[in-house]
């Protein structure tokens, strides 16, 4: 199973929209967008629409709140993650999860050359692995005391 499988599944559920914001936007604007769309990360782009970085909930907490910065006056370019790790659509889910684990990321950008396909979260990848685990999802829900158990 590959990252493309996850992107297709997100598309089937109407969750494949790629949300971007310019690096010159404020942290407050980014947080507003993230809240509006109930997402945990935004792709940050340059004025030329090139990938500049990624801005995540963790960036808000560790680089803005913890540092005592004013979200209304702080541009994303100062606090976004610039060292973006990415996967291609053909990357296996296991390899993507390993990359997330090693680099402590919850989100990965999906790129193929200069073409930006989207973002996948650890939750998106885990859901697909569990969903295709031939009944393991139901067993995991029962063990966790989830709904219907």
Short names for language-model regions:
Residues 1-149:
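Tandem CBS (Cystathionine beta-synthase) repeat/Bateman regulatory domains
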């Amino acid at each position: 199973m590959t990252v493309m499988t996850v992107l297709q599944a997100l598309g089937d559920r109407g969750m494949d929209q790629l949300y971007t914001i310019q690096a010159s936007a404020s942290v407050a604007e980014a947080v507003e967008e993230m809240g509006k769309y109930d997402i945990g990360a935004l792709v940050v782009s340059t004025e030329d629409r090139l990938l500049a970085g990624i801005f995540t909930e963790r960036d808000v907490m560790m680089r803005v709140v913890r540092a005592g910065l004013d979200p209304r006056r702080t541009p994303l370019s100062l606090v976004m993650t610039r060292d973006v790790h990415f996967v291609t659509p053909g990357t296996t889910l296991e390899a993507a999860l390993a990359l997330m684990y090693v680099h402590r990321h919850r989100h990965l950008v999906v790129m193929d050359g200069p073409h930006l396909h989207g973002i996948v979260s650890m939750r998106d990848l885990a859901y697909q692995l569990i969903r295709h685990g031939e009944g393991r999802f139901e067993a995991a829900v029962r063990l966790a005391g989830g709904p219907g158990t």
